[in-house]
Curated annotation (Swiss-Prot):
It catalyses: isopentenyl diphosphate + 2 oxidized [2Fe-2S]-[ferredoxin] + H2O = (2E)-4-hydroxy-3-methylbut-2-enyl diphosphate + 2 reduced [2Fe-2S]-[ferredoxin] + 2 H(+); dimethylallyl diphosphate + 2 oxidized [2Fe-2S]-[ferredoxin] + H2O = (2E)-4-hydroxy-3-methylbut-2-enyl diphosphate + 2 reduced [2Fe-2S]-[ferredoxin] + 2 H(+). Catalyzes the conversion of 1-hydroxy-2-methyl-2-(E)-butenyl 4-diphosphate (HMBPP) into a mixture of isopentenyl diphosphate (IPP) and dimethylallyl diphosphate (DMAPP). Acts in the terminal step of the DOXP/MEP pathway for isoprenoid precursor biosynthesis. Isopentenyl diphosphate binds at residues 50, 83, 133, 230, 232, 274. This is 4-hydroxy-3-methylbut-2-enyl diphosphate reductase. Dimethylallyl diphosphate binds at residues 50, 83, 133, 230, 232, 274. The keyword Nucleotide-binding does not apply. The keyword tRNA-binding does not apply. Binds 1 [4Fe-4S] cluster per subunit. Its cofactor is [4Fe-4S] cluster.
Amino acid sequence: MNVIRARTAGFCMGVSLALRKLDREVDRAEEKAAQGSPRCRIATFGPIIHNPQVLEAYAGMGVRCLRQVDEVEAGDHVVIRAHGVPQQQEKALRSRDAVVVDATCPKVKKAQLGIEEQCRAGRTLLLFGEAEHPEVRGLLSYAGEGALVFGSVDELEGLPLQPETEYFLAAQTTQDRVAFEVARAWLHERLGHEVPVLETICDATRLRQQEAIDIARKVDAMVVVGGFDSGNTRRLADVAAAQGVFTVHVENESQLPVEQLRGCGIIGLTAGASTPKSIIDATQRFLESL
């Protein structure tokens, strides 16, 4: 089986940075314990990234995943997830007697602050994203009153837009660039003027999606590897499938539909921004063995 593997597959800068920060806290805790000091409790606030294998590995190291601020105990070292958290939660975390390490992706943090600046200038946010995604909940916390979220152009068309309101447009950092531009054009037509835009979709997302499209146009089937909870991985699968090629999204090689793939001559392989290289490698080896 011939496999074309995306060069952009695997950890992005934001994920790598978040994991390095968490690893540093784990290492420091182990060093203190080795010196005879009590081992401090390490936790993340929400899943550090959306990958089940990575989360399982950290759980095996004793890292807890907290969901509520009141779960934080005195002396805890708490690492904020790569997706960021609502600013009210961050303030509450920092009010606890704990060490708080912010592992929010720098691209997400930039989006948060950009949204806050626009809203302070009197504009109202139109956010292209998944309403229930943790990054989106965090972004909205910087937007104040009146912010509107839409997950598609169809949803945008159904929003109660007011002609007298000064809007600005932003997106979840891992959103589909093409769909974002369609939304931008629709707003221009609907409101009769260009809406100010925050360019919040990160370059890594754009490059991954474009490479997935390019590969999908050359192959008989496309395999996308990554957590089912990972929004950026789901969108890679979406943009690949939109090219008309059979596309499957799996979390590891054991989930591959072997019989459907066996007859393919060339298979494309890409992976989400939170997928470890070891899982991508294992998937590639399995595909090449078919």
